[in-house]
Amino acid sequence: MDHRTPTPDNPWLALRNLTPARIALGRTGTSLPTGAQLDFQFAHAQARDAVHLAFDHAGLASQLSDRGRDSLVLHSAASDRHQYLQRPDLGRRLNEDSIATLRQHTQANPGGVDLAIVVADGLSALAVHRHTLPFLNRFEEQAAADGWTSAPVVLVQQGRVAVADEVGELLGARMTVMLIGERPGLSSPDSLGLYFTYAPKVGLTDAYRNCISNIRLEGLSYGMAAHRLLYLMREACRRQLSGVNLKDEAEVHSLESEGSASQKGNFLLGKG
């Protein structure tokens, strides 16, 4: 006689091919199968590692230089990772040395710019390392015809979203785009977030920002994120505002695979 606890068939199992989300995990008796439990622990470890991974700003600056882009490396008022996690307010402001660096740059390059791109580690430096350059490649390809002037790419260590407001104000930028590592999830330790602000200045709330989230190969493609950002930027320049009063109404004809532009259609329905 077989005394093993039977594992019931799981009708949701086929849906696991459509999403990295933790669905259709199955069960053994009243508990999760061993494999699902181990996968959960591994995903949790990946999320913790993403939060504490050091920002390789020197490596990113070197890659930007190889593409002909200048960069400025700055630091928030949070002195280290521990203080960054304990004091979110310090991650929203620059330290004194960084403020002085931006002021010197502005004095040497008066007149302001249309766009300041700010990159910060946030809660996942892994996301920044993986997705910043591929996204910027797609964005700059699509934005070339607009003729916007831009400042050097600003790399902020221990930075939070609002630090881009201070950067933009000091540079005299009409718009800022913040690329930042999002809080890791159990299936997405490397999601890149994007925050767009028109007329940045210190003290703005989230109501004045537009967010485009989950930029990564398994989420929103680089091309689609760039398309949505450009729509917001063009509308912001026309209407002179951003945030809750500016809705993302960019036309999206179909989902595009980053690997092949010919793969179109809704992933839930199969290939179009």
UniProtKB/Swiss-Prot annotation:
InterPro entries reported for this sequence: EutC (IPR009246), EutC_C (IPR042251), EutC_N (IPR042255)
Record's keyword terms, sorted: Bacterial microcompartment, Cobalamin, Cobalt, Lyase
Main location: other
Subcellular location: Bacterial microcompartment
EC number, as in UniProt: 4.3.1.7
Catalytic activity: ethanolamine = acetaldehyde + NH4(+)
Protein name (database record): Ethanolamine ammonia-lyase small subunit
Origin species: Pseudomonas putida (strain GB-1)
Name of the gene this protein is made from: eutC
